[in-house]
Amino acid sequence: MSPTRARSTTHADAIAQGFDQVLWLFGNQQYATEAGASNFFVVWRTKEGGLELVTAGLENKTILEGITRRSVIELVNARKDDAQSWTVDGTNLEPLTVVERDFSIDEIRETVAEGRLVEAFASGTAYFIAPVRHIRHREADVAIPREKGDSGHYAALIKGWLSDIVYGRSSFSGWTKVVKETS
């Protein structure tokens, strides 16, 4: 899947306007929930300087608990204190703190305006991680930063972690089991 362009509208309208997915917003607060049928994540710097991986929480039941979402959260939490895990293409990255909570499109726009948004991506079983590069909300365009071409460093790193586990290049906490062939 190519980098995702998300828009807060109907799916058919989004496709007609050149977007790949809809960023679903919930309630009057317009909380970001999912991108299509995928879980949505943002990486942003807090006003205090911390670096967070933020995704909608499960308590309001506005999103599905996707297995890839859970995998992303587990991997980031497990590798938080392992500095060697946070390198992609020779770039050392600052570890992320996972935050599961409601967050609004207005917060996303604020972090962009203040230069605190690092990147955004969607997670799903079919494609693991797809970077989000653009959101249109109420006819205003929100450009999502990407430091690594079409992807952000964190999206590329997490996608690499998942790929390595799926294809047997590394293991993680009992996620995989080798099944021996019998003749």
Regions found by a protein language model. Name each.
Residues 1-183:
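Helix-start/capping segments and mature chain N-termini
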